[in-house]
C-alpha cells in the first residue's frame, strides 16, 4: 500500500503530559511489531485536526526506469522497463498545476463532494534510474495521484501524445484514464500546517 514518511495524528486528553519522551517510548513499545514509529509530540489547540487543519500535503512517487528492478526497493518503487521521456513527463506534469476539475482521476468510490483541487507544484526529477514525481496540494481526491502518474506513464512511453494527455485530463471521465499506478511506490512525504 501507500507509505508515509511523515504522517500526523491527533488525540484529545485531559491528562497532563509531563514527560513527552516517556510517552513516545511507551507508544513505540506498543507499536514495535508494526511498520510505524512515533517521532515526536506537539501540543495543539482544541480546534486542531490532523486531517482538516493541513495547509499542504506533499506526495512523492518513485519510478525505477531500468531494465532491472532494484531488489532492495522491491515493493517500494514502480519498476518500468520501457524508457520514459523525462522532457515529455515534465511537460505533462506541468499541466496539472493550478485549480482544475480532476474528475478524470477520481476513484469510483470517492466520497469527496467536488473533484476541484488546486495543485501548487508538480516536479519530475531523475537521479540515475530513479524518477521522482512530487505533488503538492492542500488536498487530493481518492486515487488522484496514482491516476495522474498512470497517465504520465502513458505519456512518457509515448503511448499518448501531449494532445491526447490533455484531452483525457479535460474529459472529466474516469473511463478515459490510464490504469492506476501501483500504491507501493507512493509516499506521503510531509504535511504542512
Name each region found by the language model.
Residues 1-193:
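Structured-RNA-binding interfaces characteristic of tRNA pseudouridine synthases
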Amino acid at each position: 500500500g501507500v507509505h508515509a514518511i511523515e504522517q500526523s495524528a491527533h488525540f484529545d486528553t485531559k491528562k497532563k503530559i509531563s514527560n513527552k519522551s516517556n510517552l513516545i517510548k511507551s507508544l513505540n513499545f506498543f507499536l514495535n511489531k508494526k511498520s510505524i514509529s512515533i517521532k515526536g509530540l506537539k501540543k495543539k489547540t482544541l480546534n486542531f485536526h490532523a486531517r482538516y487543519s493541513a495547509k499542504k500535503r506533499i506526495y512523492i512517487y518513485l519510478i525505477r526506469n531500468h531494465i532491472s528492478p532494484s531488489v532492495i526497493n522491491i515493493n517500494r518503487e514502480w519498476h518500468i522497463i520501457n524508457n520514459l521521456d523525462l522532457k515529455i513527463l515534465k511537460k505533462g506534469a506541468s499541466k496539472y498545476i493550478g485549480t482544475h476539475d480532476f474528475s478524470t482521476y477520481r476513484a469510483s468510490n470517492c466520497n469527496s463532494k467536488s473533484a476541484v483541487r488546486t495543485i501548487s507544484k508538480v516536479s519530475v526529477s531523475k537521479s540515475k534510474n530513479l524518477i521522482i514525481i512530487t505533488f503538492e496540494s492542500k488536498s487530493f481526491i481518492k486515487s488522484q495521484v496514482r491516476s495522474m502518474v498512470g497517465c504520465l506513464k502513458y505519456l512518457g512511453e509515448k503511448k499518448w501524445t501531449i494532445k491526447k494527455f490533455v484531452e483525457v485530463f479535460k474529459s472529466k471521465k474516469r473511463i478515459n484514464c490510464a490504469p492506476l499506478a501501483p500504491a507501493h511506490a507512493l509516499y506521503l512525504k510531509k504535511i504542512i500546517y
